[in-house]
Amino acid sequence: MTDRLLNGPPVVSPQEWETACQQLLVKEKASTRARDALAAERRRMPWMRVEKSYTFDCPKGKVSLLDLFEGRRQLVIYRAFFEPGVFGWPEHACRGCSMMADQVAHVSHLHARDTTFANVSRAPQPDIERLKARMGWTMPWYTITDGFDADFGVDEWHGTNVFFRDGDNVCRTYFLNSRGDEALGSTWSYLDITPLGRQETWEDSPEGYPQSEPYKWWNWHDSYGVEQDGKWSDVVDAAQAIPA
């Protein structure tokens, strides 16, 4: 009895394995550069003004789409299917949507880049709060009360919409669904689909977009907003001085 894959790849020496890794790394770096270029193109997409008003339920009552930003400029909304008719209701949300919820990065890192994340569903708030408590989810999760899902392409299938707020004006800036959602979950993946991106100096962004040095804005998720002593910046500088 063996655990080896039937007709699997050959088992080679450490030297041969390293050579194969380096050969693949060339293609992986090309893929990363292509992904960065695509994100830069995404940041230059035209926007669509949101003309209608939308209302959601939350634990504290009724809120508007503008309220969902929580004062930040960018908003990422994932449409999770949790409602009557969904497999698992009322104990569970859609299995795929639940996996997505399990993968969401700690939202404090997104907040540090002026970005809010939220889930929306058709389920009433008591059911959502009960589900969140049992599954250990902490992201904001609102109840759709009107035509928001139909208007933004998420009435019959999951999807992620991105919005930007300029004062009280809201624009839709990006949308993806189906397998496009597979890559989401990390802080970077969400920032890369926003109009401002990661807001780091290496990015190709339109002139005037906010940017700061990479790594230096990073923090523990419970320490954003706390005055820093500059030691982390020194660590970053020292690390970047080491030849790659």
Feature map (PLM): residue ranges:
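Short beta-alpha junction loops
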Residues: 122-125, 147
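Short internal beta-strands
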Residues: 116-122
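Non-globular targeting/processing and membrane-anchoring segments
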Residues: 1-113, 130-136, 140, 146-244
